Amino acid sequence: MLLRMTEFVGCLFVPSTTFLLLFSVKSAKIILLGILPTERSMKMYTIENLYDLTHTMAADYLKGFTYPWEALKGIKDMIIALGATLNKDDFIEREPQVWVHKTAKLFPNIYLGAPCIIGANTEVRPGAFVRGSALVGENCVVGNSTELKNVILFDNVQVPHYNYVGDSILGYKAHMGAGSITSNVKSDKTLVVIHCDPEIATGIKKVGAMLGDNVEIGCNSVLNPGTVIGRNSNVYPTSCVRGVVPENSIYKKNDTIVAKR
């Protein structure tokens, strides 16, 4: 199914569903172009529907919120409190409020700012800059010249090459291709709005991207402030994404979204 916002000429809401169907009438035929989230479908972008909380040490913290961006303000305090409870047989406090699992692999020439937690079997590669307030799960890759700031990375997340991830939450097995980044501040410095129907005012100046489980972001893509990507969705390389992308979808160019088959 294809959605191209500039082409549809009509719409139909289907009762008992969470989608608005878009269609084009050509040669007396109705051609289904795709799906557009309605207010009822915003539940797809809740923490419950984006993430499997069994794959993060922040599970108890995240359960206290409905939408993921609501959790951003408290990440620093959460990490400090969580770090104090970690098993000292498993984690080393390398310096105040910097906890690293004994099985994590730290390469030379990295920076780990407090507070942060680096999980089991995670690699932090040369040139990585963890500015602080970063909870990195198990089996993750924080790659060369990658910068993290005020983030939660679920287990098995990979940000392996020249990525910037700020004020964001990345779900289980989310992967960002080389050079892809999250933009977390609007150019006019106003508060970030989640562009769905209806729009949601976050009341926050800095909001990056919320990536559901198993999301793939193509190389050199930019995720604009407040972008939300549903579970199991892909974003094409060099894309500029703004707003929300439904689960099980492929985001192409020019706001074209294709449902996975």
Where are these regions (language model features)?
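Glycine-rich hexapeptide-repeat left-handed beta-helix
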Residues: 58-60, 153-155, 160-261
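Terminal amphipathic alpha-helical/low-complexity segments used for targeting or macromolecular assembly
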Residues: 7, 11-14, 25-97, 232, ...
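Alpha-helix boundary/capping motif
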Residues: 6, 18-19
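Long amphipathic N-terminal alpha/beta scaffold segment
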Residues: 78-123
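ABC ATPase A-loop
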Residues: 99, 117, 135, 210, ...
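Extended, compositionally simple hydrophobic/Ser/Thr-rich segments
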Residues: 116-117, 122-152, 156-161, 166-168, ...
